[in-house]
Amino acid sequence: MGKVTGFIEWKRDKQPYRPVEERTRDWRQVMLPWPVDTLRKQGARCMDCGIPFCHQGCPLGNLIPDWNDLVYRDKWREAIGRLHATNNFPEFTGTLCPAPCEGSCVLGINDDAVTIKAVELAIIDRAFEEGWIAPEPPVGLTGKTVAVIGSGPAGLAAAQQLARAGHQVTVFERADRIGGLLRYGIPEFKMEKRVLDRRLAQMEAEGVRFVVGAHVGVDRPAEALRREFDALVLCGGACAPRDLPIPGRELDGVHFAMDYLTPQNRRCEGDRVPDEALVSAQGKRVVIIGGGDTGADCLGTVHRQGALEVHQLEILPRPPDTRAADNPWPQWPNIYRVSSAHAEGGERVYSVSTVRFVGDERGRVKALEVARVEPVREGGRLVFQEVPDSRFVLPCELVLLAMGFVGPERPGLLEQLGVTLTDRGNVKRDEHWMTNVPGVFTAGDMQRGQSLIVWAIAEGRSAARGVDRYLMGRSDLPAPLP
């Protein structure tokens, strides 16, 4: 390592952001770039561990100590080579990943972890700015064809790996643009879509073909694709949202998070979305049910739309400020965090469960009846019991359901192919990422269930190796996951 005492000399710096009063008036990226000298010092805090546990936290197996040291030594072009060796899309993970690698950082045992995520993002941004990112087309073609169904991070990772291996790859996306949740689920202020588009341009130059408006299993029979292509990779994600079937669910003003986020993202893309198709929070009291990342995306969006007030509800208790005794390193630290959206305002309410939606005489939601709850163990299972005499009412005109996703959509594609599902309703696969149907593979949330973007990319890369092996009898493609 270039600076073995860096972790002693320099403390962890915080991610810089645009001022709240400025950023909530537009939809541009909220994060600011780090000064180069600051990044070099942050990279120097990587402490030359005998066993770098950051690898344990990263599903991709990123060579984190290598590129931290290269940044410290101002060798940025070498750094992007090390970074791309394990990660197709560091601009996505460097922006959107919660950084489980930092949760496993050895320095985090008794100090603040290394700013791995910030250094990663700086490397890839510098590489694009310098023109170091160029298409990497294959030396020759194999004559084999692969259809990737779904264009989220898992599908894109699989497609790029397979195209570079010489296969002719076509990505099918049911929406009108490529990107999946990266396109229409992630708000513009969190990741500007130009970041996605520049990577897609590289993939097209490498030979990947994109087909949009193609809902395989609905307007394109799955069997037709099986006849046309030598292999299929199912990367359709876990798109079925978790509902809240309580009294009043049918009221106007109660929406799934994705039904709220998608039209606004379309407007940010420049689409003409009619006012009646846009779910707007302007001038309304808003309640977001769900305390995860999707809830935070909704929170930042309602701020920019001009909500009157916002409450975000979470059924779990408020996390502690530091690790609990039963949450030791190198586990992911379950601690209280403040995202950029939370820093912009709104009230977070913990240990509550919604009892019913209350409507007015016109059939519109006007309030929520909510109860305090406490977690208890029953037969080894965590359940939430209502605290007696704890109910209260939250007035609102808009409710957003952001409680996650329960799995892939079964009608259409999965039913037509006849793939086997797990007990949790996800697509089942073998050790080579193939389903029970020969030549049909799967990766990402469709087989794992809802998860992190870093897992999706890792699974896409791993499935690509399985496909390559199936088509060619062997494969030299790397696979970070078994």
Language-model features and meaning:
Residues 123-140, 198-218, 241-305, 421-436:
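Glycine-rich dinucleotide-binding loop and its adjacent helix/turn
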Residues 295-300, 305, 446-477:
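A conserved FAD-binding loop/helix module that cradles the flavin
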Residues 5-32, 61-73, 78-87, 109, ...:
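Beta1-alpha1 glycine-rich phosphate/pyrophosphate-binding loop at the start
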Residues 23-37, 42-45, 350, 358, ...:
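C-terminal catalytic lobe of FAD-dependent flavoproteins
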Residues 250-283, 376-450:
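FAD-site-proximal beta/loop scaffold in flavoenzymes
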Residues 78, 140-141, 145-149, 197-246, ...:
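Feature captures the FAD/FMN-dependent oxidoreductase FAD-binding
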Residues 44-66, 89-110:
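Local cysteine-cluster metal-coordination motifs and their immediate loop/turn environment
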Residues 4-18, 29, 43, 47, ...:
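Short Fe-S-cluster ligation motifs
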